[in-house]
Amino acid sequence: MSDKVCVFAGQGAQAPGMGKDFAADPEVAALFDRANGVLGFDLAKICFEGPAEDLTKSNICQPAIFTMSVAAFRAFQKKFPAVSFNMAAGLSLGEWTALHIAGVLGFDETLRVLEARGRFMQEACSAQPSGMISVMGATGEQLDAICAKASIYKANINSDAQVVLSGSKEGISIAEGVCKEMGIKAIVLQVAGAFHSPLMMPAREKLVAVLKDVAFAAPKLPVLANTTGALHSNDPQAIKDVMLRQVTESVRWADCIKAAIQGGGKTFIEFGPGKVLSGLIKRIDKSVTTVNVSDVASLDAIVL
């Protein structure tokens, strides 16, 4: 059995120029052309050239990171055709990439879902000023106290040492003050709103109608679910339900990685722009190997 786990980047990793060198391969170029056709705008141009402001819009950013991550994965497969994976995971929108790679839904369908998901999340952010704050080194009890005092929520449990909280702008401001009083390091993030919290319920409700018409299949590769930190079931409807919950519930990334390691994962290969996940994974367990495929140079540097 393979000891390799493929992991896929989430929102925030985007940067102009991403995927451009992969697109020198005609097969990857065709992937971007297909995305352009499905979405009805020039996604490739925005990925390759920017502007960065366009790339930060959730309805563009989410399908862009997905397409670039799939391109990186296909380029890897072409170079290492004999390499197999024992499971897949992705951070937030990256979980959709993992489900596509596992055969749960097609490329075109995933693009359409992510464009809508991004648009709905952006609309929810515009309707209510909200934000996120990254908290480092707090205990579970301290995090509970911060959330209670500020009326905010745990959004991303990235490692035992780093948790991102989501809530109203006022709540985030209160949390920042509480952290200062407690002597806990905290950084307010430059994001559009309170992702992975109940404040995203309007987006989740709109996504229900979109997913109703999308056919899901049982995964051909085990995929870890952000909301549970455990593997998705083989029931397509159950996967759909979990992915709807993901919009408003905590991302239990640390639990996902611990489950992957318990399941035999020793080498984590990150696909997509940047190497944020590799850093998070190393914080969870220093003994594992992390590799990232973000451009042709990083792919060429891999020795397996």
Task: Please state what every model-predicted region is.
Residues 2-142, 189, 267-297:
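FabD-like malonyl-/acyl-CoA
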Residues 11-13, 41, 102-241, 245-246:
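Alpha/beta catalytic cores of group-transfer enzymes, especially the acyltransferase/condensing modules
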Residues 261-264:
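Non-catalytic positions within long, well-ordered alpha-helices that form the structural scaffold/packing
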